């Protein structure tokens, strides 16, 4: 039975992208109703009679649509968030990771295994250009999450990288870069215009190196590191997120941790303890 109920109201639910297994093509989309506390699985497949694809990496809401980035299928689907039906797609991407909207007609799409960030027109579902990322080859190319400060977009470079890039959105050029620790995995901007990124430090035997992870606070205006919070070897922090007020950080390090953005040290006790499960993704209810 592929019938699925149409949602009478948007704004009271949570979309969950289920990555699936790399090269198995078994990614799915689920919808959790926060009012009824019920979940619908396979909503994309049931609404469109087609599979979502190979590795559902991320999803962004913009312009009344849900934009699902399917990494190893080289595609971004735009769906109606009420009916879950596809309304368009952007194809011929290399290995997309995240999409950041500048306007109704311009967005950036980060990639892995490509030394370019793609420029797309979401209104026409077309690729319109590229941003060359310095110091990368196609094989080592890796750009991830994006935040914006004025006319500049900042992006963290993750796999076998150790930098943040600063992009001028008027020229679509990289105008500056900042070295941080090995493999910054995520990037957010707090209410004080401070960026936060967390590194995983690589792994033992990595050709790129291995070090203890760190959490960095970076001033968006000066693009300089203000604070480095060091973890110990063996830690594997990831998934930095902010609350709705953008004054409190959350991140995964086996447990879930919570930290005010004005703190001068990392917390010593977790917010939610690890209990017979493996935390992998994290999102914070803005309310």
Regions of interest found by a model, annotated:
Residues 11-12, 63-65, 104-105, 150-151, ...:
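Short coil/turn segments that connect the beta-strands within blades of beta-propeller domains
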Residues 38-51, 83-90, 126-137, 173-178, ...:
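A short beta-strand motif characteristic of beta-propeller blades
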Residues 34-36, 80-84, 121-125, 168-172, ...:
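Short loop/turn segments that connect beta-strands within beta-propeller blades
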Residues 2-4, 53-58, 94-104, 138-147, ...:
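Repeated scaffold domains used in trafficking and secretory/extracellular systems
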Residues 1-14:
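Bacterial Sec-dependent N-terminal signal peptides
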Residues 23-30, 75-77, 116-118, 161-165, ...:
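Structural motif
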Residues 16-24, 68-72, 109-113, 155-159, ...:
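Conserved beta-strand positions in repeat-built beta-propeller and related beta-rich domains
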Residues 125-228:
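Solenoidal tandem-repeat scaffolds enriched in leucines and small polar residues
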